[in-house]
């Protein structure tokens, strides 16, 4: 029999319903795996007692035929989802001992559906990073290793802990957040399905903010069906979030295995020309195009003329919003406070923020404050907002001709820890292919579609029209079926 922690979420639900095993056994299998692989540093807070209590309730519900959708399924949550009575830090020293007195809407939705939480996962500080190396708890190690090379690799960021937990069989699914690619890029680096829904599909209430017009909850799973199951539980209107969409949650599971015949898939190959895209990634892109052609889709060459400015636009808008959002961390009401005798209020603010924020967060606050200053507002911030509209228009125009768009999730395979650490610009380019869809608020997924020459996973990104998660999952499911001969599983796990 397959080890319980290696079952997909859908197979775990099936096994629990058939009483092949109990939720307590399933949770214990995951706890053992977490303890076995502590060195990956995927979890920053473990809630095993809570998970085992939840598993006992789940077992009772199964015995009484009262099981909910996710009854007894062990999941992990990125440490920026506020969890009532459980430490929530955003992996920053400024919030290192913060315990919220309320629950985020997304975690509450999962609890309401019967999910049990194993713990909170490591992440880049305040979700600012692409390699999970800016956390105050230290970096996360990718469970994957390249062929004939034992070097530690990054899991991607900012949701690196969530990605490592699912890839390393330490959770059935894990919540992440995606602002500019923080679910899709780590999913590509760790061989997972990483889904970011339409902006506003999942409530942002109770999520520690980075850039409010871009932040969206997402999910990591080991199959496309698992993503559909989790999304149905996570999504829905929430009056506590002013950007939440009043849209009915579709029956996403029926998309799995549905025919894509006669669907039109847009391919902006020109976006890959002259970029930092690696040959292995380009080959995967071409192979996926052939796979979809063979499945009966029509491949349409499209252009997204303004998408190439996405990274520049993002690194004006996101830091601007971050500088505003992070101004609340001042040591007055909660979080870290640095004090000494005869200190003025201004000195307390200054010393608290200097001690509490890491280098990357400080860099982005400074950039954001600069672009919002009266002398730079027109030249940078307002111009970036105009180009953001042009990027969104590019997608609107493309979607008059096609149903979905196909792009790599990342320009490279996972790289070594420390490799790009000293050059922020090179690090920012990791999000080259994910940022455009974020700027337009579109639903998108990274699905494992191939291995590099060094045996590392590569993810293909499918982007859909607003609120069209269904077709995104349909195409992702077709790609998943087409590469089922490849084992997307790290060695030694």
Swiss-Prot record:
The lineage of its organism: Bacteria, Pseudomonadati, Pseudomonadota, Alphaproteobacteria, Rickettsiales. The keyword Cell division does not apply. The active site is at 78 (charge relay system), 158 (charge relay system), 182 (acyl-ester intermediate). It comes from the Bacteria. Belongs to the amidase family. GatA subfamily. Heterotrimer of A, B and C subunits. It catalyses: L-glutamyl-tRNA(Gln) + L-glutamine + ATP + H2O = L-glutaminyl-tRNA(Gln) + L-glutamate + ADP + phosphate + H(+). One of its GO terms (biological process) is translation. It holds the Pfam family Amidase. GO terms for molecular function: ATP binding; glutaminyl-tRNA synthase (glutamine-hydrolyzing) activity. Its EC number is 6.3.5.7. The gene is gatA. Keywords: ATP-binding, Ligase, Nucleotide-binding, Protein biosynthesis. This is Glutamyl-tRNA(Gln) amidotransferase subunit A. The keyword Glycoprotein does not apply. GO terms for cellular component: glutamyl-tRNA(Gln) amidotransferase complex. PROSITE patterns: AMIDASES (PS00571). InterPro entries: Amidase, Amidase_CS, Amidase_dom, AS_sf, GatA. Signal peptide: none annotated. Allows the formation of correctly charged Gln-tRNA(Gln) through the transamidation of misacylated Glu-tRNA(Gln) in organisms which lack glutaminyl-tRNA synthetase. The reaction takes place in the presence of glutamine and ATP through an activated gamma-phospho-Glu-tRNA(Gln).
């Amino acid at each position: 029999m397959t080890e319980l922690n290696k079952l997909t979420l859908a197979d775990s639900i099936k096994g629990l319903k058939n009483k092949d095993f109990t939720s307590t056994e399933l949770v214990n299998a995951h706890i053992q795996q977490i303890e076995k692989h502590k060195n990956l540093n995927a979890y920053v807070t473990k809630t095993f007692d809570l998970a085992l209590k939840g598993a006992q309730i789940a077992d009772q519900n199964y015995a009484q035929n009262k099981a909910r959708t996710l009854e007894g399924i062990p999941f992990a949550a990125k440490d920026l989802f506020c969890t009532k009575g459980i430490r929530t830090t955003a992996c920053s020293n400024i919030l290192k001992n913060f315990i919220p007195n309320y629950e985020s809407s997304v975690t509450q939705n999962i609890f309401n559906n019967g999910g049990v939480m194993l713990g909170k996962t490591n992440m880049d500080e305040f979700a600012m990073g692409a390699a999970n190396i800016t956390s105050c708890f230290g970096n996360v190690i990718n469970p994957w290793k390249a062929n004939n090379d034992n070097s530690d690799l990054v899991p991607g960021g900012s949701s690196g802990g969530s990605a490592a937990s699912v890839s390393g069989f330490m959770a059935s699914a894990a919540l992440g957040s995606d602002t500019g690619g923080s679910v899709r890029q780590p999913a590509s680096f760790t061989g997972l399905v990483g889904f970011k829904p339409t902006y506003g599909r999942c409530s942002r209430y109770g999520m520690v903010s980075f850039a409010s017009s871009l932040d969206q909850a997402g999910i990591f799973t080991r199959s496309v069906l698992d993503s559909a199951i989790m999304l149905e539980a996570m999504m829905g209107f929430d009056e506590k979030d002013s950007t939440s969409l009043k849209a009915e949650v579709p029956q996403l599971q029926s998309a799995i295995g549905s025919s894509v015949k006669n669907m039109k898939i847009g391919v902006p190959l020109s976006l890959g020309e002259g970029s930092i895209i690696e040959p292995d990634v380009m080959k995967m892109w071409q192979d996926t195009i052939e796979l979809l052609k063979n499945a009966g889709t029509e491949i349409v060459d499209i252009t997204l003329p303004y998408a190439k400015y996405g990274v520049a636009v993002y690194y004006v808008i996101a830091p601007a919003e971050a500088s505003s959002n992070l101004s609340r961390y001042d040591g007055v009401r909660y979080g870290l406070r640095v004090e000494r005798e005869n200190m003025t209020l201004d000195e307390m603010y200054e010393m608290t923020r200097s001690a509490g924020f890491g280098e990357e967060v400080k860099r982005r606050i400074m950039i954001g404050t600069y672009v919002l200053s009266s002398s730079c507002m027109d030249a940078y911030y307002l111009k970036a907002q105009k180009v953001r509209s042009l990027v969104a228009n590019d997608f609107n125009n493309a979607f008059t001709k096609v149903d979905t768009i196909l792009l790599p999730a990342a320009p490279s395979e996972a790289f070594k820890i420390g490799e790009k650490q000293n050059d922020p610009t090179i690090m920012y380019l990791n999000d080259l292919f994910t940022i455009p869809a974020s700027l337009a608020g579109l639903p998108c997924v990274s699905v494992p579609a191939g291995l590099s020459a060094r045996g590392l996973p590569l993810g293909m990104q499918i982007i859909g029209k607003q609120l069209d998660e269904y077709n995104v999952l349909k195409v992702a499911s077709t790609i998943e079926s087409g590469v089922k001969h490849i084992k997307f599983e790290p060695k030694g796990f």
